[in-house]
């Protein structure tokens, strides 16, 4: 739908619209990472061939890059997704599409707390509050993924990790240092293909 809308606007303005495809459906081992964001990677090849090569349906759209957004903050999942994006960019190159950048959505992990003990204390006090041992510390005593069922505290915390052992530039470096099956790492692969890797700094002004 977005391609159709952007095409219509570009035609109306008589301009070329610079676009990046947001893709999803990456594999971590045998597990597929489903997402509400983007085109499924397994369908992208046929979509591009049908709409950009075999017809002029989107002739006012100019491809420049790829983007993906994953839930959570797993370094492994981001590394594997970037690996699959780079592999897909190779396929696109064979079709005449140059990938100038790949954008990793979700942002770089930042530490909003200065000390790990502060994060540990919040986790501890949240569990006490949910168990009605102290006054609520969240709105309406929400458990943020934790809950009491049959008198037992269950679930896992699903809030943003306010303190991390791996954050800032180290978080991105860890992703880019992931080794590929062809030898070398993701950073070297991207550099050899002239692909810029982008990642938003998140709420970096709040970093401790």
Which stretches of residues belong to each language-model region?
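C-terminal active-site-proximal or functional interface alpha/beta core segments in diverse enzymes
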Residues: 65, 70-208
């Amino acid at each position: 739908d977005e391609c159709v809308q952007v095409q219509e606007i570009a035609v109306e303005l008589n301009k070329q619209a610079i676009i990046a495809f947001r893709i999803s459906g990456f594999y971590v081992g045998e597990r597929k990472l489903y997402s509400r964001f983007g085109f499924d990677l397994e369908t992208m090849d046929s979509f591009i061939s049908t709409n950009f090569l075999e017809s002029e349906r989107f002739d006012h759209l100019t491809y420049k890059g790829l983007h993906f957004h994953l839930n959570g903050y797993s370094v492994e999942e981001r590394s594997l997704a970037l690996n699959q994006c780079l592999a897909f960019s190779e396929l696109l190159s064979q079709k005449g599409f140059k990938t100038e950048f790949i954008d990793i959505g979700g942002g770089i992990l930042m530490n909003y707390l200065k000390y790990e003990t502060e994060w540990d204390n919040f986790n501890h006090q949240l569990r006490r509050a949910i168990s009605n041992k102290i006054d609520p510390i969240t709105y309406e005593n929400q458990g943020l993924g934790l809950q009491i069922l049959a008198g037992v505290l269950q679930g896992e915390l699903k809030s943003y990790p306010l303190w991390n052992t791996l954050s800032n530039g180290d978080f991105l470096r860890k992703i880019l240092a992931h080794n590929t099956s062809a030898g070398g790492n993701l950073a070297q692969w991207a550099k050899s293909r002239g692909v810029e890797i982008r990642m938003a700094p998140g709420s970096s002004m709040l970093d401790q």
